[in-house]
UniProtKB/Swiss-Prot annotation:
One GO MF term attached to the UniProt entry: miRNA binding
UniProt function note: Involved in RNA-mediated post-transcriptional gene silencing (PTGS). Main component of the RNA-induced silencing complex (RISC) that binds to a short guide RNA such as a microRNA (miRNA) or small interfering RNA (siRNA). RISC uses the mature miRNA or siRNA as a guide for slicer-directed cleavage of homologous mRNAs to repress gene expression. Required for reliable formation of primary and axillary shoot apical meristems. Specifies leaf adaxial identity by repressing the miR165 and miR166 microRNAs in the embryonic shoot apex, in the shoot apical meristem (SAM) and leaf.
Protein name: Protein argonaute 10
Induction remark: Up-regulated by REV.
């Protein structure tokens, strides 16, 4: 467990110097608060030994190697980024020798000893925005949350460093070693303590062990030797245990009570490990979740995969005290099948009678590489191996040397002579195990896949659909499963929970919530309905016209679907044009050129033909819109089309799938017309409060709202860059139109590198640029005013990255503003938006139809800022959308920085109201639109990476050209968006 270095006088601090606003707008006095001061740029105080250049250009924090949600795998849910003690502890003193009582400040990652009383570090004093109070707006109600109150231990917890020799990389082997050590020595040398272990370097006890350092000898059975009946091989290990630090429970108690702002994060992490200890032994751990085929019957996902059900578990500090967050989870696992059966499922064909093609071999190799198998051809031995590859030759042709004289023997002969095993399917290749220098061959029919291996590669569309069916649970069913899980885990009988003095409630937390009112939406005066009040998060376009409908005079259509005849395509385009007209646009019924049919593999040729032919027809006037009809399964076609249109030709495009062309739905056409209008630069609707200037801390002075996100490559793409996207509102006071910019950056880099940048120009000298600066300039061009307030919604940041993201990106915002004019420092509010969390809110009474929507979920607008939220910081949960199926996931908003002095009601209402302005549908959405748009833009930009190999599901895959290596700063930039594309919401 990481131990933090104590702060000394040379530590870097964040210092914000404020200065009074020289010019006030009287409207800035909102919510009973004075106008916020306009701060000067962030200044970083550094030790005297740091040079001026180092101080002015701090290098960004190191990249986070973890993965994101739909953007990757697990991230840290709690705590700050911290350093682990050296894996090689200093040689312990002899038992008779005492340590000096003087204070010694160690180097980073080492231990600070103060009179033998070693205390665990706390989170960096980040000075995140404190909670300004609790919200009062809305209709009060009670909801239940999947949080279970946990008692705080009364004893201080002790941490010990564990060194196992020889070193072991496997957590499961480490755990087996420590389990055997506890079995042997608990009653004697361990003083009857039952320690909890993290599987790596740290051991924890409630109370001290009878020593500060001790070495033990342990022998454990080698499970991988595979012997079933008979003596098993034993391995011997030395285990050194050394006292490291103590976690102060009183400090944690004060933090939970709101009396201290600094969280003793290691103490929380220890308690998390304690409550996981028994589950680690019972189930298959994956990140913070646990899975088992015994919880529910596994469901087949196809191609040799199955779903396992499980549960997520995490201890969290909240206002009500320590809270155990329990949620249901599902994951894809490799079915424990005979390898031949797995291969047949993977390929979807009989492999025993039909020969394998080269593409079959590639697919088998990808599917089995890294998978653990056990042999079945030996009666009493089930030895396990990890697959390294596949032989290029069939089994019948495989020969290998059996002695130093290179005497060759066939694999068939070897297995017959050694094991009496006759290989039946000699046309199949063998599995290759071991390393390349000393490879071993195993016939497929002699191997079975080991149970409990999680599948970490990308799922195809069918597998995703099948997995979603398993995970999609109605709220009442999910709540019942969570309660059953808590009862099954029986924390009251958990020996580790008892040892550490932790009692867990078996009741869901009952939480006070409020339902915020939906905002009034403004539509065009020419419509029958000029404004609208959404009902339960929904409304429609009947009798309404877009508030700013655009004109489409010059358009064309390309048909890439063989099954769509020209007359069908023409009829669809007519229907779509009429819907645009009904919705408030002007749409020319005739295309510039007749509908052009093309093959999907000739997308570039077709698009350029349509572009140039149209230009000739219109005498140089460019197309305003390109409609494209695509096959339902279109592979790379969609991405190629978007890349060519947006980065080469400067065309705004709208794609439609064949199934929608044949089965025309009014609802579908209405939604497509909404997308077309904003892509053309229009607005569909705006908040009534926005145009009447009644939004606190937005309507009073020119305000720009940003959204930012970073998406990472899928598993297995170890060299593809991450994509960052930033969008910003371009209209005020409406705050509805958002321009977007994208950039590629180093693999898995979470901090957005291009927010602000400078470079040297031979003529102009130092030149400033970056996405923030460019969007501030475009706001001024669009509105005629410079922004005097910034609201920044940042998506996709885990709690462990809060500090470094705020430090780095707030500094970039400051520098971007200062580069535009001296002393230009508008106040900033920086809010992190999180959807990848496991808090779920349930109606207090599922039978009360007035407290739920049609899906059984809590009502849209439900906000919670008490009990399950942070003890002192400014955060809240908001369920802003109506559920469709499954259990709604509320978004979690954490205000890290607030120079605009928002009240709780102010930021909660603004966020909820913005969720009704999402351009692509007539529903409120689950996260604030600027963050949503940034995610869409980042996802779109991944198609710009060329050349790409598209996977079966149409998502960008690995590059087939030389790519940037991990950590390389020289990432190849994305092709630039054309200027006319940048100005509009092209990503919608």
């Amino acid at each position: 467990m990481p131990i933090r270095q104590m702060k000394d006088s040379s530590e870097t601090h964040l210092v914000i110097k404020t200065q009074p606003l020289k010019h006030h707008n009287p409207k800035t006095v909102q919510n009973g608060k004075i106008p916020p001061p306009s701060p000067s740029p962030v200044t970083v105080t550094t030790p005297a030994t740091v040079t001026q250049s180092q101080a002015s250009s701090p290098s960004p924090p190191s990249k986070n190697r973890s993965r994101r949600r739909n953007r990757g795998g697990r991230k840290s849910d709690q705590g700050d980024v911290c350093m682990r003690p050296s894996s090689r502890p200093r040689k312990p003193p002899p038992p008779s020798q005492t340590t000096s009582s003087a204070v010694s400040v160690a180097t980073a990652g080492e231990i600070v000893a103060v009179n033998h009383q070693m205390q665990m570090g706390v989170r960096k004093n980040s000075n995140f925005a404190p909670r300004p109070g609790f919200g009062t707006l809305g209709t009060k109600c009670i909801v239940k949350a999947n949080h279970f109150l946990a008692d705080l231990p009364t004893k201080d917890l002790n941490q010990y460093d564990v060194t196992i020799t020889p070193e072991v990389s496997s957590k499961s082997v480490n755990r087996a070693i420590i389990a055997e050590l506890v079995r042997l020595y608990k009653e004697s040398d361990l003083g009857r303590r039952l320690p909890a272990y993290d599987g790596r370097k740290s051991l924890y006890t409630a109370g001290e062990l009878p020593f500060t350092w001790k070495e033990f000898s342990v022998k454990i059975v080698d499970e991988d030797d595979g012997i079933i009946n008979g003596p098993k091989r034993e391995r011997s290990y030395k285990v050194a245990i050394k006292f490291v630090a103590r976690a102060n429970m009183h400090h944690l108690g004060e933090f939970l009570a709101g009396k201290r702002a600094d969280c003793p994060q290691e103490a929380v992490q220890i308690l998390d490990i304690v409550l996981r200890e028994l589950s680690v032994k019972r189930f298959c751990p994956v990140g913070r979740s646990f899975f088992s085929p015994d919880i529910k019957t596994p469901q087949r996902l196809g191609e040799g995969l199955e779903s396992w059900c499980g549960f997520y578990q995490s201890i969290r500090p909240t206002q009500m005290g320590l809270s155990l967050n329990i949620d249901m989870a599902s994951a894809a696992f490799i079915e424990p099948l005979p390898v031949i059966e797995f291969v047949a499922q993977l390929l979807g064909k009989d492999v025993l009678s039909k020969p394998l093609s080269d593409s079959d071999r590639v697919k088998i190799k990808k599917g089995l590489r890294g998978v653990k198998v056990e042999v079945t051809h030996r009666a009493n031995v089930r030895r396990k191996y990890r697959v390294a590859g596949l032989t290029t030759q069939p089994t019948r042709e495989l020969m290998f040397p059996v002695d130093e004289n290179c005497t060759m023997k066939s694999v068939i002969e070897y297995f017959q002579e050694m094991y009496g095993f006759t290989i039946q399917h000699t046309h199949l290749p063998c599995l290759q195990v071991g390393n390349q220098k000393k490879a071993s061959y195993l016939p497929m029919e002699a191997c079975k896949i080991v149970e409990g291996q999680r599948y970490t590669k990308r799922l195809n569309e069918k597998q995703i659909t099948a997995l979603l069916k398993v995970t999609c649970q109605r709220p009442r069913d999910r709540e019942n499963d969570i309660l059953r899980t808590v009862q099954h885990n029986a924390y009251d009988q958990d020996p580790y929970a008892k040892e550490f003095g932790m009692n867990i409630s078996e009741k869901l937390a009952s939480v006070e919530a409020r339902i915020l009112p939906a905002p009034w939406l403004k539509y065009h005066e020419n419509g029958k309905e000029k404004d609208c009040l959404p009902q339960v998060g929904q409304w429609n376009m009947m009798n309404k016209k877009m508030i700013n409908g655009m004109t489409v005079s010059r358009w064309a259509c390309v048909n890439f679907s063989r099954s769509v005849q020209e007359n069908v395509a023409r009829g669809f385009c007519n229907e779509l044009g009429q819907m645009c007209e009904v919705s408030g646009m002007e749409f020319n019924p005739e295309p510039v050129i007749p509908i052009y049919s093309a093959r999907p593999d000739q997308v570039e040729k077709a698009l350029k033909h349509v572009y140039h032919t149209s230009m000739n027809k219109t005498k140089g006037k460019e197309l305003e819109l390109l409609l494209a009809i695509l096959p339902d399964n279109n592979g790379s076609l969609y991405g190629d089309l978007k890349r060519i249109c947006e980065t080469e030709l400067g065309l705004i495009s709208q794609c439609c799938l064949t199934k929608h062309v044949f089965k025309i739905s009014k609802q579908y056409l209405a939604n497509v017309s909404l997308k077309i209008n904003v892509k053309m630069g229009g607005r569909n609707t705006v908040l009534v409060d926005a145009i009447s200037c009644r939004i606190p801390l937005v309507s009073d002075i020119p305000t720009i709202i940003f959204g930012a996100d970073v998406t990472h490559p899928e598993n297995g793409e170890e060299s593809s860059p991450s994509i960052a996207a930033v969008v910003a509102s371009q209209d005020w006071p409406e705050v509805t139109k958002y321009a977007g910019l994208v950039c590629a950056q180093a693999h898995r880099q979470e901090l957005i590198q291009d927010l602000y940048k400078t470079w040297q120009d031979p003529v102009r000298g130092t030149v400033s640029g970056g996405m923030i600066r460019d969007l501030l300039i475009s706001f001024r061009k669009a509105t005629g005013q410079k922004p005097l307030r910034i609201i920044f919604y940042r998506d996709g940041v885990s709690e462990g990255q809060f500090y470094q993201v705020l430090l780095y990106e707030l500094d970039a915002i400051r520098k971007a503003c200062a580069s535009l004019e001296p002393n230009y420092q508008p106040p900033v509010t920086f809010i992190v938006v999180q959807k990848r969390h496991h808090t779920r809110l349930f109606a207090n009474n599922h039978r009360d139809k007035n407290s739920t929507d049609r899906s059984g979920n809590i009502l849209p607008g439900t906000v919670v800022d008490t009990k399950i939220c942070h003890p002192t910081e400014f955060d809240f949960y908001l369920c802003s959308h109506a559920g469709i199926q499954g259990t709604s996931r509320p978004a979690h908003y954490h205000v890290l920085w607030d120079e605009n002095n928002f009240t709780a009601d102010g930021i909660q209402s603004l966020t909820n109201n913005l969720c009704y302005t999402y351009a692509r549908c007539t529903r409120s959405v689950s996260i604030v639109p600027p963050a949503y748009y940034a995610h869409l833009a980042a996802f779109r930009a991944r198609f710009y990476l060329e050349p790409e190999i598209m996977q079966d599901n149409g998502s960008p895959g690995k590059k087939n050209t030389k790519t940037t290596t991990v950590g390389d700063v020289g990432v190849k930039p994305l092709p630039a968006l054309k200027e006319n594309v940048k100005r509009v919401m092209f990503y919608c």
